[in-house]
């Protein structure tokens, strides 16, 4: 029983090393009882250790070749960027989105951004191979560089709206009078003219009994009787003008005619005259 368990243990240990060293497990096994290998001297090493050391040497050779290739690619990329004038300036010229006319405002308002120096060499990737020939996952992940955001200039309507929103509702008339010569547009409502006239008509009036006499006094409204007199004068002037313009409305103004005697010949005289005035007869007893 002890001998059978010893054979099973030795077979399992040999099978494990064959799997690690990449040997074919379908090959015929060694004849005879399997015994654990024994070392006769310090210089003698088992065959599986020799195979493992050979695999490690192959891994190191692969890593060195990959590092050399990546160094060559980094040098070629750096020379290409230097010939094009730097990747940052080239991308700024083609991807800024601003013309020469509108670009002045953006360049003046843009915050100073420190120019990132071009890296001398890219970080080298090391892909190590395991004993069985499969690539091992890298332990140190590559840190992602956050994109650089350029501040965009504000449009003219947005800047004016922020400027005028700071004013209170009752102070916009004063701002209109004080800043009337500025070129900034004033954002008002639909009934802005009515509000402006209403605020101007309701100016405060200083009392005659309070305060010192040296201050500026607002002009008081005229009494009611003065308003009535001005209305009567306006009506009289309108009536006189209407009377003066009555004769000018005709195509041929009337000529002054001598007074005719009140007799039978009056009607005949009126009929013989060529006046265009209508004949109005108050006394028709003679007809």
Curated annotation (Swiss-Prot):
GO MF terms here are: protein kinase binding; protein serine/threonine kinase inhibitor activity
Write down the InterPro entries for this protein, in alphabetical order: FAM212 (IPR029267), Inka (IPR039201)
GO cellular component, alphabetical, reads: cytoplasm; nucleus
Would the keyword Nucleus turn up in this protein's UniProt record?
Answer: yes
The question of whether Hydrolase is a record keyword is answered with no
- Annotated compartments: Nucleus; Cytoplasm
- Pfam families xref list: FAM212
Renumbered to this chain, the Polar residues biased-composition regions fall at 35-50
Give residue spans, biased composition: Low complexity. 138-147
Ranges for region Disordered: 22-59, 138-157
UniProt keywords (A-Z) are: Cytoplasm, Nucleus
Q: Where is this region: Inka box 2?
A: 261-287
Q: What is its main location?
A: nucleus
User: What residue spans carry the region label Inka box 1?
Assistant: 168-205
**Record family assignment:** Belongs to the INKA family.
The record's domain comment reads: Contains 2 Inka boxes (also named iBox or inca box). The Inka boxes bind and inhibit PAK4 by binding a substrate-like manner.
* The protein's role, per its UniProt record: Inhibitor of the serine/threonine-protein kinase PAK4. Acts by binding PAK4 in a substrate-like manner, inhibiting the protein kinase activity.
The protein's assembly and partners? Interacts with PAK4.
User: What is the name listed in the Swiss-Prot or TrEMBL entry for this protein?
Assistant: PAK4-inhibitor INKA1
Chain's gene name: INKA1
